[in-house]
Swiss-Prot record:
Presence of the UniProt keyword Endoplasmic reticulum in the record: no
InterPro entries, per the entry: Ribosomal_bL35, Ribosomal_bL35-like, Ribosomal_bL35_CS, Ribosomal_bL35_sf
Keywords noted in UniProt: Ribonucleoprotein, Ribosomal protein
Keyword Ribosomal protein recorded: yes
Protein name: Large ribosomal subunit protein bL35
One BP term from GO: translation
GO CC aspect terms: cytosolic large ribosomal subunit
Organism: Flavobacterium johnsoniae (strain ATCC 17061 / DSM 2064 / JCM 8514 / BCRC 14874 / CCUG 350202 / NBRC 14942 / NCIMB 11054 / UW101) (Cytophaga johnsonae)
Gene: rpmI
Region (Disordered): 1-22
UniProt record similarity statement: Belongs to the bacterial ribosomal protein bL35 family.
Matching Pfam families: Ribosomal_L35p
Entry GO MF terms: structural constituent of ribosome
Amino acid sequence: MPKMKTKSSAKKRFKVTGSGKIKRKHAFKSHILTKKSKKRKLALTHSALVHKTDEKSIKQQLRII
């Protein structure tokens, strides 16, 4: 049986840290930025961790499990 392919969309959106947690980027940072404050845009720049309820499905898409 051939190897399972990872989901390309998940591969582009998520990175796994050394401890096994999954990092993601924030949404709402691509356009219509004039009405958003500098503080809000700066906060959206930083990466965040995926919530634990979503970790299992993302790991399946990345073929980690």
